[in-house]
Every structure is written in structure tokens, then in C-alpha cells.
């Protein structure tokens, strides 16, 4: 009996040892897997959040002091100079105005906030946000959380109650950056304001004919989140880089959806841009096919100027579609270069021919060599390393924000695109990561 008992004791001990080995093995495997996933995640973040942004002006031979002065002058011209587009109201508010159209619109207001947070201009940012929230953001009803897209800043009468989806896109991203840069305990809870827009966006289900800013079936931004405008899009509203920012910093439980939207936007741009010229239509269906309207015939016009800059932004910040984006930049710059780098005009049919219908701007209905398009096309010189593209960089360096020979002058749209592009090419347009615990 003693021998039998001794044998069973050995067997029981062996079982316990085997169980311990299994537990140790499983725990080790889990730890290695978790560590691997963590390493991959950190590697991805480090790859695009290193803080290293190319200064293409410096690479082109311009001095850093000259570069800083040029960027600062462009900022001061828009925000403080005699032709400024930024106007302070009382002690705590301000607005950005599209001078030629005699209004303030969410496009320019949210651009102003993005510029302010990039340059660490907290007071400017706060003033524009307070004005936007007070006079444009809907605080109740089906549109709650959204913004009226246009208002007369003198009479404060809204030109429309409806939203233009790109305004909200920039407001949200700018607020998240402000939260990262300044924290949320300095008078405005930037994170809460960004989340409010997003949370209200997710409540929109068609009640009152108002929808999500993003068509949730197509996973693409809508032209307007209302009625039929929810069913098509504007290529210049496609900012995949911004969705990546939302996925990382909004923390609203929709991270995967935003990542999907970023990927969908990238693929959409492949379809929307002409295979030879790189040109896109101002408005398209979600397929990328042009979507002409009674007020906007098919063609590459003012809205579309922003597309090359948006593609540059995605390339510089995240670089997840490099092969196509590098090919796009060569095609797009190559087409404009073929028209004359100092003379290419600003509206085209997608095949590069001259359109029959010319869109008017500021009372002028004519084609011109516009600073805005020169600026955004120059920003694409950051895509890849093509020495030939430095001709655009030099052309932008030598350009000036001033009236054209016929008297037309647009410090608002030309000016903002010019400033954004100077920021890009000097390495000053960056992802703002959290700087406060």
C-alpha cells in the first residue's frame, strides 16, 4: 500500500508541475503577443509623430531667418495688417471674414482656428471660437451642435441655417489640437467642445432631414448633412489625416469608424482625380464621378484648389498611401507645368481643357493665374523627393499676396491657402500631440 500511495503522490505532483508549466507558457505567450502589438503600435506612432517635418524652403536654399520672416509676414498680413481678414469684437471675440463675399463663414473661421493653434496664438483661437459658438452654433433643435455656414458679420443675420460639412471638420480637429496644446483648464474646455460636436453628430438620424456629417453607409463626408446633400460629396472636404486625428484623440468610441473613413477617403481620391491631369471635379458622387449642379457645372474650380494641399497633409502627417500620392503629385504638377508655371489658369475641365462656364469670384468672371492654386500645387512638392518640383517652391517664394492687375484682390481665400502652403513648406504645419497630462 505504501508503494502504491507513493506512486500516486508522484503522479499528482507531476500533474501539478505540468499545469504550472502550461500556465507559465500561456502567460508568456500572451505577454509576448501583447508586447508585440504594443511595439507595433508605438512604431506606427513614432513613424509619423517624430516631430520631424521637412522644411522644403530650407532644402531649396533659403535661409531660416528669411523663411521665418516670410511666414510671419503672411500671418500678420491676414490677422493684423491693413488688408486683414481677422476682426476683433469687444474684449473676447473675433471673426474671420470673406471680404469679397461680405460674410463670415465656417470655412474661414475654422481655418483661422487651425492657424492660431499651429502658431500657439491662444487668444486669437479663443476669440474666434467664442464668436463661432455664440453666433453660428445651433444650441437646440435637429441641428443642435452644428453651425450655420454663413452670416453677415455686421448685421449678424445668418445667410443660411444649414451647415457646410468641412467647417465642422476643421472646428473639431482644431479643438482637439487646442486641447492637446493648452489643456482644458484655461477658460475653455476644448476637448468637451470637440466632443459636443461629435456627440451631437452621432445623434443625427434624419430627424428634421438632418444627418451625420459623414454618410455612415459610404463612410465619406457629405456635401451638407441635410436632405439630398447627404448623398454626395465635395472632394476638397476629404481630409483623411483629420479622421486619423479623431481616431487618436477624440476617444468617443468611434475610433475604427474614423480609421475606416480615412482609408475610404484615400481610395475615393484615387477615383475622383483624373488619371492623366490629376484634376478633380468640385462636386462628385461617392464613386468619384462628377456631380454637376445648377450652380456648379462639372469642372475643377475654386473648391478643388484645396485637394492637392489636403493630399499633401495626409502624406506628411501619416504617409499611408505614398505610392499613389507620389504619382498624383507628379501628374498634377506636371499638368500645371505644361501650362506654364507662371501662367497656368485656375479653372479646367478634368481633361485639362478650358471650360465653357467660368465661375465668378468677387464680381470678376475670368480665368487668372491665381495665388491660391499656385500655393496648394506648390505644397505637393513635399510629396516624394523630386528635385524638379522645386520650381513650384521657388515660384511660391517669389509670389505676393497683392491685387491683380485688373484690381481683383482676395486676401481671404488666396491669402489663407497661401499661408497654409507656406506653413507646409516650412515644416510648420504639424500634428499637435498632448503637451499636458
Regions found by a protein language model. Give the residues of each.
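Solenoid-like repeat scaffolds
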Residues: 397-406
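Bacterial Sec-dependent N-terminal signal peptides
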Residues: 1-36
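N-terminal carbohydrate-binding/catalytic regions of secreted carbohydrate-active enzymes
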Residues: 42-168, 174, 181-184, 304, ...
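Extended ligand-binding clefts on enzyme/binding-domain cores
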Residues: 37-73, 102-106, 144-146, 160-166, ...
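Helix-capping and short linker residues that terminate individual alpha-solenoid repeat units
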Residues: 137, 183, 202, 206-207, ...
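Solenoid-repeat scaffolds in large eukaryotic assemblies
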Residues: 112, 124-125, 187, 194, ...
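Active-site-adjacent structural elements in enzyme catalytic domains
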Residues: 127-134, 176-177, 192-202
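Active-site or metal-binding loop neighborhoods of secreted/extracellular toxin and effector enzymes
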Residues: 422-425, 432-437
Amino acid at each position: 500500500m505504501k508503494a502504491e500511495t507513493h506512486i500516486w503522490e508522484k503522479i499528482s505532483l507531476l500533474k501539478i508541475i505540468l499545469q504550472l508549466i502550461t500556465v507559465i507558457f500561456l502567460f508568456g505567450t500572451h505577454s509576448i503577443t501583447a508586447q508585440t502589438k504594443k511595439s507595433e503600435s508605438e512604431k506606427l506612432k513614432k513613424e509619423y509623430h517624430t516631430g520631424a517635418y521637412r522644411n522644403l524652403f530650407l532644402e531649396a536654399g533659403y535661409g531660416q531667418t528669411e523663411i521665418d520672416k516670410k511666414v510671419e509676414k503672411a500671418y500678420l498680413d491676414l490677422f493684423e495688417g491693413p488688408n486683414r481678414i481677422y476682426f476683433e469684437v469687444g474684449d473676447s471675440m473675433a471673426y474671420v471674414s470673406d471680404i469679397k463675399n461680405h460674410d463670415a463663414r465656417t470655412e474661414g473661421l475654422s481655418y483661422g482656428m487651425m492657424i492660431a493653434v499651429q502658431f500657439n496664438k491662444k487668444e486669437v483661437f479663443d476669440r474666434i471660437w467664442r464668436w463661432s459658438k455664440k453666433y453660428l452654433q445651433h444650441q437646440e433643435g435637429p441641428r443642435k451642435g452644428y453651425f450655420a455656414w454663413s452670416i453677415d458679420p455686421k448685421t449678424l443675420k445668418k445667410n443660411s441655417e444649414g451647415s457646410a460639412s468641412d467647417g465642422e471638420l476643421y472646428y473639431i480637429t482644431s479643438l482637439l489640437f487646442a486641447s492637446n496644446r493648452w489643456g482644458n483648464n484655461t477658460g475653455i474646455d476644448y476637448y468637451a467642445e470637440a466632443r459636443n460636436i461629435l456627440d451631437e453628430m452621432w445623434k443625427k438620424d434624419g430627424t428634421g432631414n438632418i444627418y451625420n456629417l459623414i454618410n455612415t453607409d459610404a463612410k465619406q463626408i457629405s456635401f451638407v448633412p441635410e436632405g439630398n446633400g447627404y448623398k454626395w460629396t465635395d472632394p476638397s472636404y476629404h481630409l483623411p489625416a483629420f479622421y486619423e486625428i479623431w481616431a487618436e484623440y477624440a476617444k468617443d468610441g468611434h475610433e475604427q469608424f474614423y480609421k475606416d473613413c480615412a482609408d475610404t477617403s484615400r481610395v475615393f481620391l484615387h477615383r475622383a482625380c483624373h488619371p492623366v491631369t490629376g484634376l478633380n471635379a468640385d462636386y462628385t458622387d461617392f464613386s468619384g464621378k462628377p456631380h454637376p449642379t445648377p450652380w456648379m457645372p462639372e469642372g475643377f474650380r475654386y473648391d478643388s484648389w484645396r485637394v492637392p494641399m489636403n493630399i499633401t497633409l495626409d502624406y506628411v502627417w501619416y504617409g499611408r498611401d505614398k505610392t499613389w500620392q507620389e504619382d498624383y503629385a507628379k501628374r498634377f504638377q506636371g499638368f500645371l507645368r505644361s501650362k506654364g508655371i507662371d501662367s497656368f489658369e485656375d479653372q479646367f475641365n478634368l481633361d485639362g481643357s478650358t471650360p465653357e462656364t467660368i465661375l465668378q469670384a468677387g464680381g470678376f468672371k475670368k480665368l487668372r493665374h491665381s495665388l491660391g492654386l499656385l500655393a496648394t500645387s506648390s505644397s505637393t512638392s513635399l510629396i516624394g523627393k523630386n528635385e524638379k518640383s522645386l520650381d513650384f517652391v521657388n515660384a511660391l517664394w517669389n509670389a505676393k499676396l497683392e491685387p491683380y492687375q485688373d484690381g481683383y484682390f482676395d486676401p481671404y481665400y488666396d491669402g489663407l491657402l497661401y499661408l497654409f502652403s507656406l506653413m507646409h513648406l516650412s515644416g510648420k504645419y504639424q500634428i499637435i500631440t498632448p503637451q499636458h497630462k
